Amino acid sequence: MTYQALPDGLFIQNSPIAGQGIFTNKPLEVGTELGISHILDGKDMYRTPLGGFINHSDNPNCEKYRVNMKYYVKVIRSVDPMEELTLKYTFYRV
């Protein structure tokens, strides 16, 4: 298997929200798994490009969830092509 920084169809570009963000060039349906955003390793946490470039929104189209020592991102509402992917950030959690 070849490593991909972002899943097919996702790309990084300047964001109207802040700095740069992650966008899609294809429609994404509810429940689509986008991949790993963070990996826990003891006291350390490593961020992937997916976790590093996804911006905050109070009305996000994605959510993160934890399985063992990894955080994943999935789509929680339909996303149109060229729409930015967003999460609702929390202060004390990844």
Residue spans of the language-model regions?
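Conserved catalytic SET/PR domain of SAM-dependent protein methyltransferases, capturing the structural core
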Residues: M1-V94
